[in-house]
Amino acid sequence: MKAIIGKKVGMSQIFDENGHVIPVTVIEAGPCTVVQKKTSEKEGYNAVQLGYEDVAEKKLTKGEMGHLNKAGVSPKKHLREFDLDNAAELNIGDIVKADTFQAGDFVDITGISKGHGYQGVIKRWGAQRTPTSHGGGPVPRHAGSMGSSTDPSRIFKGKIGAGHMGVDQVTVQNLSVVKVDPELNMLVVCGAVPGPKGGLVTIKSTVKVHKVKQAGADISKNPQKASGRNPQKASARNK
């Protein structure tokens, strides 16, 4: 697995070779410093801890500064642990840059979604408005009755309701890397990324294999049709 920490810069759009508009997100990826290296002999598993974004020493706790001073690394604001493929090759103090990814790679990006404050059931969960006529009630955007009467005489757990919306950890999978700029430490990915501008994101190799249809593959057969499942029965039925 390949991984890096970064910040969302914003969204833009590009044109492909066919003239189609593609929405993209620009991410400032790295540089990240290797702060700690974990091994199966000592910790029981192999992993690498990366630090991102320099910060003033006074903004960190003594425990955090002791951890960073032990590694001989300047104060870092964000620390994340990853199970990298080249963990054995990395040493404490090494720099991981945006060029760890290449154009055409597929990645999973995790961030904190935008906060929307206190919202009702319509915006928060996509609930339907109540009827505005025939006794629909005084407030069309309020939730209707959920507790019934004597039985069950309560609201089941997990029912939708008004409340705080956003500021949740969200992962978007299978985004393709369109462009990599090692000099500016920039990644350009196709699609939207959770979070506001300047929000922290982690970029990792996708956990799901992105299947691409091979050229010349026979896509005319529909497995849902009888002819696709059993051609002999279909031919006998058509006689």
What is the meaning of each model-derived region?
Residues 1-239:
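Extended basic (Lys/Arg/His-rich) segments that typically form rRNA-contacting surfaces
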